[in-house]
Amino acid sequence: MRWAIVRFPGANCDEDARFALEKAGIRAEFVWHTERDLRGFDGVFLPGGFSYGDYLRAGALAAKSPVMEAVRRFAEEGRYVVGVCNGFQILTEAGLLPGALLANLNLHFTCKEVGVRVERNDLPFTRLYPRGQVLRLPIAHGEGRYYADPETLARLEGEGLVVFRYAPLKDEADYNPNGSLHDIAGIVSEKGNVLGMMPHPERAVDEVLGNTDGLPFFLGLVREVAR
């Protein structure tokens, strides 16, 4: 299995993504943002960071990069695309996922571990998690507040397109770290092949760091190929 990790100027989670994919047994290769051909890859990973310095809006300039034309074709063919943090922002700016990621309600960059509940486990990314499991995953963003108009929110909820939702790790009342509507932490496309999420599963895959809650996310992709 061979995945492309897109490197945008300002991205800083590309090495984390490579480590996580390779730990799961997936061959990972870096692809520069000027690339126009993604043939030969089984999946595409858009990593976190600050692409183009977050000028205009987070992900706005990266969404216009040449590689995104290839990513769009890749997604339209039904192949897997994952965007984490800035990658999620890029997917919404490119129109590959609905909604937008706005500034956190506290107007601060927030970096901590949060509770993330698995809403669906019938996708390659989540099939190794029990539905309803609350994961402990890191976040690190200043613009992670998911927003969509009421009609879009109703469609996301009605069609089961919300995959991850912020949830209490213990009994804390302020578990939503950024003010995302409906506590949304991650969504998927109607075809189920394009996933965007703000928490970082790739930063929770190693026992040395004391947390492997993100590893099944990547192992599920391997299991999908083996089916």
Swiss-Prot record:
<keyword id="KW-0658">Purine biosynthesis</keyword>
<dbReference type="GO" id="GO:0006189">
    <property type="term" value="P:'de novo' IMP biosynthetic process"/>
</dbReference>
<dbReference type="GO" id="GO:0004642">
    <property type="term" value="F:phosphoribosylformylglycinamidine synthase activity"/>
</dbReference>
<feature type="active site">
    <location>
        <position position="202"/>
    </location>
</feature>
<feature type="active site">
    <location>
        <position position="200"/>
    </location>
</feature>
<keyword id="KW-0436">Ligase</keyword>
<comment type="subunit">
    <text>Part of the FGAM synthase complex composed of 1 PurL, 1 PurQ and 2 PurS subunits.</text>
</comment>
<protein>
    <recommendedName>
        <fullName>Phosphoribosylformylglycinamidine synthase subunit PurQ</fullName>
        <ecNumber>6.3.5.3</ecNumber>
        <ecNumber>3.5.1.2</ecNumber>
    </recommendedName>
</protein>
<keyword id="KW-0963">Cytoplasm</keyword>
<keyword id="KW-0378">Hydrolase</keyword>
<keyword id="KW-0067">ATP-binding</keyword>
<dbReference type="InterPro" id="IPR029062">
    <property type="entry name" value="Class_I_gatase-like"/>
</dbReference>
<feature type="domain" description="Glutamine amidotransferase type-1">
    <location>
        <begin position="2"/>
        <end position="227"/>
    </location>
</feature>
<dbReference type="Pfam" id="PF13507">
    <property type="entry name" value="GATase_5"/>
</dbReference>
<comment type="function">
    <text>Part of the phosphoribosylformylglycinamidine synthase complex involved in the purines biosynthetic pathway. Catalyzes the ATP-dependent conversion of formylglycinamide ribonucleotide (FGAR) and glutamine to yield formylglycinamidine ribonucleotide (FGAM) and glutamate. The FGAM synthase complex is composed of three subunits. PurQ produces an ammonia molecule by converting glutamine to glutamate. PurL transfers the ammonia molecule to FGAR to form FGAM in an ATP-dependent manner.</text>
</comment>
<dbReference type="InterPro" id="IPR010075">
    <property type="entry name" value="PRibForGlyAmidine_synth_PurQ"/>
</dbReference>
<feature type="active site" description="Nucleophile">
    <location>
        <position position="85"/>
    </location>
</feature>
<dbReference type="GO" id="GO:0005737">
    <property type="term" value="C:cytoplasm"/>
</dbReference>
<dbReference type="GO" id="GO:0004359">
    <property type="term" value="F:glutaminase activity"/>
</dbReference>
<keyword id="KW-0315">Glutamine amidotransferase</keyword>
<dbReference type="GO" id="GO:0005524">
    <property type="term" value="F:ATP binding"/>
</dbReference>
<comment type="pathway">
    <text>Purine metabolism; IMP biosynthesis via de novo pathway; 5-amino-1-(5-phospho-D-ribosyl)imidazole from N(2)-formyl-N(1)-(5-phospho-D-ribosyl)glycinamide: step 1/2.</text>
</comment>
<keyword id="KW-0547">Nucleotide-binding</keyword>
